[in-house]
């Protein structure tokens, strides 16, 4: 990559990757405020926010991203450009200004804004608004109530607060050329590919329709007729009476040795579509996954019986008593929604499955290793680029953007002030529902403000975004224990507002490269966020009130899809960090104090790698050892399971290694299109199945609809532990 000193041409970017991907031209006459943009953008945002929230409670929660909309809206946009009338007419109150439903051909700038709308509908890649989890755990797990208005304010303010941080930092991490945001180049490449002239017999649009129909038609098989195909765990079939064999072979509750799926939702759940992940990322995830699942976990469980691991399932996100029974969480919550210490001491300390304990330890290590790794391997580069961003000349893209009216700073200041005031009112006047005191909001906002700039710089220059959710949970758990909802509210305001800010800034940089007027970006992001958040809570409220025993796996009908795996982990985190508190889990009063050593191990790991790199500079493979990626490879487990990882790695390797290497022209034309079509086809069929047979509770009952047939995988292996449905040694 060229450095700033080596670079002198003022008409190109100083970053080589940007020079190769982003055009240095702009046509400011292209219309962006078109009927097509608003029509397709609002529909896309509404549809994605509905579908993503709808799927979020399912066992395999498919996340439909903006790429689906990017591909699907292209032919629709061209169709509207052909059929809409071109007549120009005036609008009341607009003077002599004229407006047309069809100002000309469907252009790339319209397409970008539609995709930004869609990105808001997918909560910027997260699926649904993170704060919806608070409403879910209150209603479905704790069995308490929260008002709709309190829930809506939580969702909207936590997202818009992130927008305020983004506005304050836009000048520092969007406009400078050296803040180049590598992930945006994928989007730029896709937009350019989609808008190139397509003279092939099999156009991208035709391929998309064919693949969508196939995906739509096939999903009825694993989605309704033969649900066992979601996790084909053949080891369990071969050893129907062996607990150990089923622990090893279960794709949903075990190590998943040999388990695979024929269900796209299982492939793309949690980790998103493997077709859009580069192979080097897949390889890093594979190494980290294999090390944990097939080496560390078996050794800790069967080899050392660490923390009495064999008293509990090997793979579970549930919480347990010391004798292996499921912990009765509601029993230790008093009428004030706080920890009942006497009832807690009666049940005893909370115990985790070996896998769940290791994931927290690896989470600690990942946080520490990320900071150390970035400081050692990228610190000088980040410092140089940030210095250049102040002193360096404007690049061609920043100069081209000067043609458009900038966003006044007072827009962001006003938004930030209003959001903080509304949030303070929420904490003061609805404190009985959210528990968080006003000083908690101030502390969370201060943490978000402090961390947003360095995290944005790291993401903009290295494409790594350190996850700081555990830090916020840990801090609030130490300061204000015994109050679960206060803890998760603190996490959402502190961590997620920062994460949202990074996502907003990423979109701003995409608009910067695509030469989208900044005020158009502002309004589309803001309107999309409000619309998506409102639809998220409306759909969640409907599902929580209409699906009987939703999220209660032990009370749901067999093989019900409404198990809420992500919210189960969110609930467990509220218990561990908020209700019981880290002192009683990872401190002197808990069983897992030794897990804190993972912080030190994670911090020292990159130092060792960096030292080896300095000692042996000719060994080119040493700096490729990326410990944050390796340690964080299984960050989505739980709720993700072994079958999700197995299938994601397999499919990603096929397409992004073999197809990419040996059929590159096909990959360039159709890979992203296929990914979008698979997501869309499954989404439409799943919704159709729910409204046609799901609401009527019409289900099939035969061997192929009774799960993966690994019922013994949930059993402990220690002697004398009694669990319903499990053999006693």
UniProtKB/Swiss-Prot annotation:
PANTHER family in the cross-refs: ISP4 LIKE PROTEIN
InterPro entries assigned: Oligpept_transpt, OPT
GO CC annotations on file: membrane
Function: Involved in the translocation of tetra- and pentapeptides across the cellular membrane in an energy-dependent manner.
Tissues where this protein is expressed: Expressed in flowers, leaves, roots, and stems.
Cross-referenced NCBIfam families: ISP4_OPT, OPT_sfam
Keywords: Acetylation, Membrane, Peptide transport, Phosphoprotein, Protein transport, Transmembrane, Transmembrane helix, Transport
Key word Phosphoprotein present: yes
Gene Ontology biological process terms from the UniProt entry: protein transport
Primary location group: membrane
Ranges annotated as spanning the membrane: 37-57, 61-81, 123-143, 148-168, 177-194, 207-227, 256-276, 279-299, 352-372, 410-430, 438-458, 522-542, 592-612, 621-637, 640-660, 673-693
Modified residues (Phosphoserine): 8
Subcellular location: Membrane
Top-level lineage group: Eukaryota
Organism: Arabidopsis thaliana
Sites bearing N-acetylalanine, chain numbering: 2
Key word Metal-binding present: no
Family: Belongs to the oligopeptide OPT transporter (TC 2.A.67.1) family.
GO molecular function: oligopeptide transmembrane transporter activity
Membrane topology designation: Multi-pass membrane protein
The protein's name in its UniProt record: Oligopeptide transporter 4
């Amino acid at each position: 990559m060229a450095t700033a000193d080596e670079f002198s041409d003022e008409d190109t970017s100083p970053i080589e990757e940007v020079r190769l991907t982003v055009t240095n031209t702009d046509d400011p006459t292209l219309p962006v405020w078109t009927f097509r943009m608003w029509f397709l953008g609002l529909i896309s945002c509404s549809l994605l926010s509905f579908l993503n929230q709808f799927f979020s409670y399912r066992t395999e929660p498919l996340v439909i991203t903006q790429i689906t909309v990017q591909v699907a809206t292209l032919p629709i946009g061209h169709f509207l450009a052909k059929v809409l009338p071109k007549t120009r007419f005036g609008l009341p109150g607009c003077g002599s200004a004229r407006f047309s439903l069809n100002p000309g051909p469907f252009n790339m700038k319209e397409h970008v804004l539609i995709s930004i709308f869609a990105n808001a509908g997918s909560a910027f890649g997260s699926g649904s608004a993170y704060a919806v989890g608070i409403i879910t755990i209150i209603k479905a797990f704790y069995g308490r109530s929260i008002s709709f208005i309190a829930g809506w304010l939580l969702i909207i303010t936590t997202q818009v607060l992130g927008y305020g941080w983004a506005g304050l930092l836009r000048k520092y991490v969007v406009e400078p050329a050296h803040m180049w945001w590598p992930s945006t180049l994928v989007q730029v490449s896709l937009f350019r590919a989609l808008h190139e002239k397509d003279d092939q017999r099999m156009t991208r649009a035709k391929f998309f329709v064919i693949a969508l129909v196939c995906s739509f038609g096939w999903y009825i098989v694993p989605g309704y007729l033969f649900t066992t195909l979601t996790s084909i765990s053949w080891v369990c079939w071969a050893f129907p009476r062996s607990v150990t064999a089923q622990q090893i072979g279960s794709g949903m509750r075990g190590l998943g040795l040999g388990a695979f799926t024929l269900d796209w939702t299982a492939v793309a759940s949690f980790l998103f579509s493997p077709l859009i992940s580069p192979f080097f990322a897949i390889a890093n995830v594979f190494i980290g996954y294999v090390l944990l699942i097939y080496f560390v976990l078996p050794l800790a469980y069967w080899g050392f019986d660490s923390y009495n691991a064999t008293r509990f399932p090997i793979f579970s996100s549930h919480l347990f008593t010391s004798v292996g029974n499921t912990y009765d969480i509601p029993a230790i919550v008093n009428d004030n929604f706080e920890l009942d210490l006497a009832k807690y001491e009666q049940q005893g300390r909370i115990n985790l499955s070996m896998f769940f304990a290791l994931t927290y330890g690896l989470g600690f290590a990942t946080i520490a290793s990320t900071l150390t790794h970035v400081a050692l391997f990228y610190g000088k580069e980040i410092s140089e680029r940030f210095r250049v961003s102040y002193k360096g000349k404007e690049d061609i893209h920043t100069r081209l953007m000067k043609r458009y009216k900038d966003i006044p700073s007072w827009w962001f200041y006003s938004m930030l002030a209003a959001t903080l005031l509304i949030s303070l009112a929420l904490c003061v006047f609805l404190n009985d529902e959210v528990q968080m005191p006003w000083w908690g909001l101030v502390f969370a906002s201060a943490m978000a403000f402090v961390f947003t700039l360095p995290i944005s710089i790291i993401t903009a220059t290295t494409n790594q975004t350190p996850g700081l959710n555990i830090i916020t949970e840990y801090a609030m758990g130490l300061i204000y224990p015994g109050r679960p909802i206060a803890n998760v509210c603190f996490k959402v305001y502190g961590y997620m507002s920062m994460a949202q800010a990074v996502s907003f800034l990423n979109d701003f940089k995409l608009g910067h490269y695509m030469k989208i007027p900044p005020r158009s970006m502002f309004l589309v992001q803001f309107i999309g966020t409000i619309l998506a958040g409102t639809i998220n809570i409306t759909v969640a409220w409907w599902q929580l009130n209409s699906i009987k025993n939703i999220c209660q796996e032990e009370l749901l009908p067999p093989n019900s899809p409404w198990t809420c795996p992500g919210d189960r982990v969110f609930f467990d985190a509220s218990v561990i960090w908020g209700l019981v508190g880290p002192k009683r889990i990872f401190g002197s009063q808990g069983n897992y104090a030794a897990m804190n050593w993972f912080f030190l191990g994670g911090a020292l790991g990159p130092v060792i790698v960096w030292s080896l790199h300095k000692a042996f500079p000719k060994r080119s493979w040493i700096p490729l050892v990326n410990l944050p990626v390796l340690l964080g490879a299984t960050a989505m487990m739980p709720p993700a399971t072994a079958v999700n990882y197995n299938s994601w790695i397999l499919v990603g390797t096929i397409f992004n290694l073999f197809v990419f290497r040996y059929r590159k022209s096909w990959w360039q034309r159709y890979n992203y299109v296929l990914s979008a079509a698979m997501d869309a086809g499954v989404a439409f069929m799943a919704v159709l199945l729910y409204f046609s047979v799901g609401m009527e509770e019409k289900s099939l009952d035969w061997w192929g609809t009774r799960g993966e047939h690994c019922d013994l995988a949930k059993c402990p292996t220690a002697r004398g532990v009694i669990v319903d449905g499990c053999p006693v040694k």
